Amino acid sequence: MSYSLHYFIRKTSTRYQLTQLAGNAGLHADISWVYLMEDIENTDFLRGGELVITTGMSIHSEQTLLAFAASLKRKQACGLLLNVGHYITKIPLSLISYCDENSLPLFTMPWKIHIADLMEQYCN
């Protein structure tokens, strides 16, 4: 059973301290899976509909982050959630603009929140 991204975010945003930064027009999409992706070259493994979470461990520039978001959009991911505070400390305005212009929902979650807890909640 899949849920809309809007429903999932509404049910989990307080518990996991999620903040939406962009892409409101894409919230109607269904989530097929919550996918942790650290190797940004592996977007070919996506099937579509994934809410992709990353810590940004392999993202070392604004251009790389933008290219990652564009690749997620091409692969029809339903959203991007950045686990911020360790590898990613600042969200570029260019990323926020890109996600808004392309209806790709963009969220942040503090580093102190365990990614596995969010993934488990979706699975249950």
Task: Label every model-predicted segment.
Residues 1-124:
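Alpha-helical/coil-rich non-catalytic "connector" segments in signaling and regulatory proteins
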